[in-house]
Amino acid sequence: MFKRATGLTVAMLGMVLTAPAVAQPAAACQAHGQAALEAWTQGRFDQVGKDFAPVVAGKLTPEMLRQVWGQLQSQAGSFRSLGALAPRSLGGQDVLVAMLTFSDAPLAAIIHCDAQARIDGFRVVPAASVQPVAAAPEPAIAGAVSRAMPVPSPLGLLPGTLTLPEGKGPFPAVLLVAGSGPHDQDETIGPNKPFRDLAAALAKAGVATLRYDKRTYAHAAQIDAKAFTVDDEVTNDALAAARLLAQQPSIDPRRVFVLGHSLGAMLAPRIGQRDPRLAGLILLAAPARPLLEISAQQVREQGQRSHETAAQIAASEQAILAEQKLLAAADPRHPPVGSFGGMPQRYWLSLHEVHQVEVAKKSSMPMLILQGGGDFQVSPTLDFSRWQQALAGRPQTDFHLYPGLSHLFMPAGKTETVADYQTPAHVDAKVIADIAAWVKAQPAR
């Protein structure tokens, strides 16, 4: 469930191992944290936890550290360098941050210590997520009017932007729900901003949008990792945002749609199930299979492209198989303890209980399902085709496959790795035109 640079493997780039209390960065903490990161990046996994606090040492075994390190490299590319830890304030909390440079995507390590300078927080996130949340002012969009619209969440407001067409309205509106990982409201991936592309072009076509920073981006330091679920990551904030959007005078409350991308698309039927007032659902690159099944496919394919050994790939596949068996036998009332791939078992169990295709089949909402033919993360044959087969004959359901487009609905690259996302591009105009036409053709609910 990372996308990881965008994506489907939550374990990898969003590795949240603890939810520390009050950080106290000091010389001893800095020394311990730097030594732990050096041991980890050099493959000395049995030495990483020398200065871990008991709460972390019990979760991050040498084998778990080895496993996550392999996942990071399979998704972010080969490791290049480790920077020095430096004090930072994230979400109102003092921590230590060091940059990790990989061939395909930059990451950041975040270290937190307790009062005894023992490491009680150790996580890795996309480098962009440690940048200040207060970004530069929203650039003007020709033919549109944008204004700030924060979305309420239990951890605090999520910065958001409402983009309206020029004119009086009320307008049909689309709520943009991002994929897995800590994403800003533009769903920024390298130099690309797919959600900003959608907001700008849809406004010109007469459709309003609301996009917002994810909770994992805006308030990462406040998240309780032990209790974190996929509804906390996606569903609940999307429902709050949809209600807020429908309340705006410039928006037609009977024509509010949800557009989900990747994990956001996987959760779109669940969002529609919980808010029957929505006018329809738009799924971009929607996984039809369980996320761990997709992760296993990614481990094989990305591992081969990254020149991992057969033994390394097999070990990663076996770990995923063991996790699948654990979740299949788990009691939802008593989630397994511990974590997998850096995420708590409660989170994995919440994903295991998502049955997006079955929920979609029972829904009466109009649906538009879009897929890039060059997507190496969500499969055009194993996922998109499954949606087509399962929903064949379902009323008010439309499908579009776009040959040559990537997971971001931009021109697909040649490497079939996340390195392709570092090439500047924009969401294909045909995709946006199809979305706008479909939205405007749907009746008010």
Q: Locations of the language-model features?
A:
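N-terminal cap/lid segment of alpha/beta-hydrolase-fold proteins
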Residues: S129-G169
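Primarily recognizes the serine-hydrolase "nucleophile elbow" in alpha/beta-hydrolase
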Residues: L244-Q302
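Accessory cap/linker subdomain of secreted extracellular hydrolases
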Residues: G280-K362
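Alpha/beta-hydrolase active-site loop
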Residues: A227-P249
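Conserved alpha/beta-hydrolase "acid-adjacent" motif
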Residues: F376-L382
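Short, surface-exposed "cap/lid" segments of acyl-processing enzymes
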Residues: G167-A201
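Short beta-strand/loop motif that positions the catalytic acidic residue
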Residues: S363, I369-Q371
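Short solvent-exposed beta->alpha transition segments
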Residues: Q30-A31, A35, D46-G91
